[in-house]
């Protein structure tokens, strides 16, 4: 960040921007001046799509180590001096969750919430064989769950074996599971169709 009344920084692989900053938009971290988490999230609204903007907001709100709060983000949106991205910010705010653990979970959750399917509960706590577990996205009424399988779930042998065991335990407890990977983030309609089939098979009769 540069002092006021100076030109935007120019350097290789760096794009400088000039912006109007409100009091509280600038914070210091380790001796470096930065825009605050809330102001940065607002600025990202001009370049990210809705799903990724929600994912960024979810990361700020993550309940185990929150960087911000919904109230502070709402205040930042209200004070934001530019119209760029404002519509997207306002669409994103009611979709934010403090319980989405990762970007893929957030993206799939946004797809589910903005479709005609019921809203899932992120990181829903269940007990499988007496052990506390969490299902990434869950419909407890219908016992339908969605789980993200990142690449580390494949390359880490212990993780892979644990995933299979937990998946089987969930089925034994009556859950119908939908698994998705990074590739599915580029084909979300398939995830929605699979989820809808599971829900209808468990008694969901559609929106309304």
What are these model-derived regions, one by one?
Residues 1-119:
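Phosphate-handling catalytic interfaces
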Residues 2, 138-140:
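Short hydrophobic/aromatic beta-strand micro-patches
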Residues 117-127:
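A short acidic/basic microdomain associated with nuclease active sites
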Residues 118-120, 135, 144:
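Structural detector for hydrophobic anchor residues on beta-strands
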Residues 125-133, 140-208:
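Basic, glycine-rich
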């Amino acid at each position: 960040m540069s002092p006021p009344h100076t030109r935007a920084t120019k350097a290789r692989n760096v794009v400088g921007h000039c912006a109007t900053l409100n009091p509280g938009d600038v914070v210091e971290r380790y001796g470096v001046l930065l825009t605050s988490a809330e102001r940065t999230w607002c600025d990202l609204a001009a370049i990210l799509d809705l799903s990724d903007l929600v994912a960024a907001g979810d990361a700020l709100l993550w309940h185990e180590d929150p960087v911000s709060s919904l109230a502070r983000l709402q205040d930042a949106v209200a004070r934001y001096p530019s119209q760029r991205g404002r519509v997207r910010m306002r669409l994103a705010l009611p979709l934010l969750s403090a319980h989405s653990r990762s970007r893929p979970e957030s993206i799939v959750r946004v797809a589910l919430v903005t479709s005609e399917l019921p809203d899932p509960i992120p990181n829903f706590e269940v007990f499988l064989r007496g052990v506390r577990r969490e299902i990434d996205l869950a419909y407890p009424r219908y016992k339908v769950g969605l789980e993200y399988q990142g690449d580390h779930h494949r390359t880490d042998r212990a993780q892979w074996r644990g995933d299979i065991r937990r998946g089987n335990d969930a089925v034994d407890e009556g859950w119908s599971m939908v698994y998705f990977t990074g590739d599915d983030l580029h084909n979300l309609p398939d995830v929605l169709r699979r989820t809808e089939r599971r829900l209808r098979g468990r008694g969901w009769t559609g929106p309304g």
